[in-house]
Design a protein with these regions (language model features):
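Basic, helix-initiating cap at the start of DNA-binding domains
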Residues: 1-23, 31-32, 53-56
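Alpha-helical DNA-contacting segments of helix-turn-helix folds
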Residues: 20, 53-62, 70, 97-100, ...
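HTH DNA-binding helix-turn interface
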Residues: 22-25, 38, 45-55
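Append "Primarily bacterial transcriptional regulators
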Residues: 28-35, 44
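Amphipathic alpha-helical linker/stalk segments
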Residues: 56, 60-82, 118-128
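Helical hydrophobic small-molecule/effector-binding pocket
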Residues: 79-103, 108-112, 144
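Amphipathic C-terminal alpha-helical segment
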Residues: 96-100, 144-162, 176-184
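Amphipathic alpha-helical packing segments from all-alpha helical-bundle domains
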Residues: 104-130, 134-145, 165, 169-180
Length: 184
């Protein structure tokens, strides 16, 4: 008779997610997770075919949290909010940021989701409505590159000016640089 499962799938995901946030994705193994749950690895494998399946669930959950950050209103400027959310996520949830963007778990889908959020937000800005689609794509790609770089530096602890105002000023520098896109 098989042993009764003592942890639900959701409980295992929650404990693993706590580990992800504090220790990072690479620290999550069946053995380390079982130790945190005060059990053997058997209950984990009772719900997940492999640790990779569990880790995929964790990255999916981290991506959802990332998307929540980029839709918040940090300023009165919709275009700035998504970028600020990106960098604030990297600052506040550096291990989640690393799991989503720096460990090979990032794919085109998350970039497209981010792009969709940005485009829906910036459409609220009257100036953006005048910009041609080709320029919008160009602007998005440049902003993505800059913001992803700033977020990475922040998550790694290399960007020292990472207060909300510091992030805002860094991103405003980029917006000022690209301001001519809106003016043409």
């Amino acid at each position: 008779m098989p042993k009764k499962v003592i942890y639900t799938r959701e409980e295992i995901i929650e404990k693993a997610y706590e580990m992800l946030k504090s220790e990072g994705l690479n620290q999550i193994t069946a053995r380390t997770l079982a130790k945190k749950l005060k059990t053997s690895p058997a209950p984990i494998y009772g719900h997940f075919d492999s640790m990779e399946v569990l880790k995929d669930e964790l990255v999916k959950k981290a991506r959802e949290q990332f998307l929540n950050y980029i839709i918040k209103n940090y300023t009165e400027k919709p275009f700035l909010n998504a970028g600020m959310g990106f960098v604030i996520f990297a600052r506040e949830e550096s291990e989640l940021f690393r799991a989503v963007f720096l460990m090979g778990n990032s794919d085109k889908e998350i970039i497209l989701e981010f792009k969709d959020v940005i485009f829906s937000e910036v459409e609220k800005d009257e100036r953006f409505k005048k910009v041609e689609e080709e320029k919008k794509e160009w602007l998005f790609n440049k902003c993505w590159t800059y913001t992803h770089g700033l977020a990475t530096l922040t998550a790694m602890g290399w960007e020292k000016n990472n207060s909300n105002d510091g992030i805002k000023n860094n991103l405003l520098d980029l917006i000022v640089f690209f301001n001519d896109v809106f003016e043409k």
